[in-house]
Amino acid sequence: KNLKKFYKDIKKVVRDNNYDYVLRMSQFSISALDLLAAKQGGATHLIMRSTNSQITGGTLGEMINKLFSWMPRIIPTAKFGPSTESADFLFGKNSVKNGKAKVIHNAVPINNFIFNYDIRRKKRKELGLEDKNFVLCHIGRFDEQKNHKFLIDVFNEVYKRNNNAILLLVGEGVLKEQIKNKINNYGLQKHVKFLGLRNDVPQILMASDVDVFPSLYEGMPNTIIEAQATGLPCIISDTITKEVNISGNIKFLSLNSNINEWVNEICTVNLERNDMREIFIKSKYDIDSVCSDFINIVFENEI
């Protein structure tokens, strides 16, 4: 609300605490202004991470982002994103290819996500799920970007084919009540579970049979990386970067395709689960590998 005061406050905090390294994570180009304030406060290492591949805020947001697009390209001393797409979005076209920015994957503590049948059975029982239930899950805030309306349309058709289908929705958000109304209009309220914000996401993913993620856009969705870590098959929109396909167990579908194409893919997923530890370590999506990359890029070879 008060940009000038905010700028001064950042500068003061950095100066008073003698911070040398400052990290700013954002999808907005104007956020690089915070790093400029940090620089004036004495910080010499200005790190910026892009968090998305598209702007939110409609036309006005796009205009503001374009107006300040120069800032994240010249102010940070180190620049990175979770995918090539997200890095190029904030730091300029071909920023990764030209060596102006780096990709540091969204990583997971892989040992926490290795699929375990005992954990699956225990969590399904806790959630009131039966062995016969075919469980779809979606993890994401109730926001236009996550496209819950489309998800509910898809689930309605899945349920028509398999009345043992259950949908788990993890998250909170401003559109939650609107989505509840849509579910009630379909008469699906007994077949959709709102789980809220959780600290047992790995277990919920293990309890599920397929992850459905029809986002309008994403940078690099962490929830899909986590889902793959548990060996869960994922059906996701083709608006999402192909870089997210670590396991080879992802199906990309167009949001413009016939809804039955989504339903067919969901209803015919392979329910077999595999240990993903080796693949994640080799692909540098485990937290230990990524930490060393982060240290190298941010603290040693700044861009």
Descriptions of predicted regions:
Residues 197, 216:
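Aromatic "clamp/platform" in nucleotide-sugar-dependent glycosyltransferases that forms part
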Residues 130-146, 152-155:
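Conserved donor-binding/catalytic core segment of Leloir-type glycosyltransferases
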Residues 22-43, 55, 65:
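An aromatic- and histidine-rich active-site surface loop
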Residues 76-115:
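A short, active-site helix/loop in glycosyltransferases that binds the activated sugar's phosphate group
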Residues 114-129:
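A short helix/loop element that forms part of the nucleotide-sugar donor recognition site in Leloir-type
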Residues 272-303:
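A charged, aromatic-enriched C-terminal amphipathic alpha-helix characteristic of glycosyltransferases
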Residues 224, 233-237, 242:
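Short hydrophobic beta-strand element within catalytic cores of glycosyltransferases
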